[in-house]
Amino acid sequence: MLPNFENARVLVVGDIMLDRYWFGEVSRISPEAPVPVVHVSRTEERPGGAANVARNAAAQGAPVSLLSVAGKDEAGDSLARLLHNENVNVVLHRDAGLNTTIKLRVIGRQQQLLRIDFETSPSHEVLLSKLADFEKMLADADVVILSDYGKGGLT
């Protein structure tokens, strides 16, 4: 059984990513190369990495804040929207030189066929501003979760 999170103020700090899924059917092999051709019929976006940790804590009833770095891009906007919809207070330091990490998975007939990663590391200046926010937010947290996926947001 999980502990009761309803009264614990949770702060999640770490690497966020957008998990994208393209689902479809494979009916043939490409004539250009020996690879399956996927006819995409459905797509999904889900919070990944530290964003998924924050979403899971919020689902347990905890008031959750997430502190992270994202690019000034569509993927960063999507993550902020998805987390807002899950009642996560999102504090994102947006870096114009950073591509928000995306993990794109292509699924055919219930089998993952391919994963494509889009990622870059955040700037030193953005990390310093995040550190300043962390010091401010720490006093209001009962639980702190550091979620490091090696993308440069923590290490």
List the model feature ranges, each with a label.
Residues M1-S27, H39-T155:
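Ribokinase/PfkB-type carbohydrate-kinase core domain
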